[in-house]
Every structure is written in structure tokens, then in C-alpha cells.
A protein has these predicted regions:
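Generic short beta-strand segments
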Residues: 71-77
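Short, hydrophobic/aromatic-rich beta-strand segments within well-structured domains
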Residues: 68-71, 108
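Residue-level marker of positions within ordered structural domains that often coincide
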Residues: 37, 75, 114
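Noncatalytic regulatory segments and standalone regulatory/sensor domains
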Residues: 63, 81-154
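Cysteine-nucleophile protease catalytic domains, especially the papain-like/related folds used
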Residues: 2-66
Length: 154
């Protein structure tokens, strides 16, 4: 229990959460960069890539075994709208079944093919339809808030 509390406090020092707002992507990138500097890790993080480059950047990060943090941002510019992005689970027959909807949530991309991103959310495996993600971003959100934390070598 003590180590868990210690870990939580350490994380809070790098990643402060803004009450009622959460953590915007730029604040996540700033916390990761602070962690890299303190640990003398020769990497740099920034939030956001051009929409047309997102799939290439995700692929490159996965190939280099760099964690890909994907923000499925809130509705933008009006965050209290209720539009969400579907997460899918893959059944034993290899078909994708709708599981739950998300917005204003970070997930970790662990794999990608032509149609789906394999993601982890709270330790569970899901899939995001790549075209549905683009549609969500373009119609209900924005690449300003729905994007990746791009990590690369300095």
C-alpha cells in the first residue's frame, strides 16, 4: 500500500490533474518531458501531429517500441455535447463487437492494421475503427484535442 501511495504522489508531481477538466494533451506532454529530463532520457514528447500524418507517426512509434498515447478528446468546441467514439471487442470468430463509447479519454495504442487500432484502456483490450476515429475527430472533436502524444528521440 505504501509503494502504491508513493507511486501516486510521484505521478501527481509530473502529471497534475486540473479539477473538473482533467489533463489536456499539452500538459501530459509537458509532464512526460519533465520525467525525461529528470531521468536523463534522450527522448522528447509533444502533443499532436498533423491529421494526415497520424497513422505514419503511430506506425513508426510502434515499430520503435515507443508507447503511443492516443487522446480521444472531448467534443470541440462545445465539450458538453454527448457524441462519443465506439470501442470494440474482438470475439472468438475474429469479428468486432461494439463494447463501449468514450470521449475525453486517453488510451494506449498497442497495434494497428489497415482498419483498426488495437488499444488498451484500464488494462483491457479494445479496438478502434480508424475511419470512425477520423470521422469523430472531424465531425465532433478536433485534432487539437484528439491526437497522439508524439514521442521521439532528441
Amino acid at each position: 500500500l505504501f509503494r502504491s501511495l508513493e507511486c501516486t504522489e510521484t505521478m501527481r508531481s509530473y502529471f497534475p490533474v486540473i479539477p473538473f477538466f482533467g489533463m489536456p494533451g499539452w500538459l501530459l506532454a509537458a509532464g512526460i518531458n519533465r520525467y525525461f529530463r529528470c531521468g536523463r532520457i534522450p527522448l522528447k514528447a509533444s502533443f499532436g501531429v498533423l491529421g494526415r500524418n497520424i497513422w505514419n507517426r503511430i506506425s513508426a512509434m510502434l515499430v520503435h517500441d515507443i508507447p503511443v498515447i492516443l487522446a480521444v478528446g472531448p467534443n470541440f468546441p462545445i465539450p458538453h455535447k454527448r457524441h462519443k467514439l465506439m470501442l470494440y471487442e474482438k470475439n472468438g470468430r475474429g469479428t468486432y463487437q461494439p463494447s463501449m463509447e468514450i470521449s475525453a479519454h486517453f488510451v494506449t495504442v498497442t497495434g494497428m492494421d489497415e482498419n483498426y487500432m488495437k488499444v488498451s484502456s484500464w488494462g483491457r483490450e479494445y479496438y478502434i475503427d480508424r475511419q470512425e476515429f477520423l470521422n469523430y475527430v472531424r465531425k465532433y472533436s478536433s485534432f487539437l484535442v484528439s491526437n497522439i502524444c508524439y514521442i521521439r528521440k532528441k
